[in-house]
């Protein structure tokens, strides 16, 4: 996996070909690290990913929750014909994420403010 810096305070994290029980932790550790470094927009690039199992989906949901709690954005670059896009559609999880056809499209999209919860 490689990280590719792009403008506008975002970073692209390339996901591996296959994400399953054995590889999910390593893949998503890079996403967490980017958010922990203060990057406000992290793009998970699934362009070359041809397989992901339920472990990968659970980790992705966890990263999404963590990003939202940190007032950051997780964007997914998933080509329209990708098997990953199909999995997200079948499971209904595609509605939980900001999906883009490429990392370039994800990077060019305007930042969507994450609502901050009021403090008591």
Where are these predicted regions, by residue range?
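Short beta-strand/loop segment at the start of cytosolic alpha/beta domains
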Residues: 1-14
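Amphipathic alpha-helical interaction surfaces in cytosolic regulatory modules
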Residues: 21-97
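Short, charged, intrinsically disordered terminal tails
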Residues: 98-120
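Conserved beta-strand termini and adjacent loop/short-helix elements that scaffold enzyme active sites
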Residues: 15, 77-79, 100-102
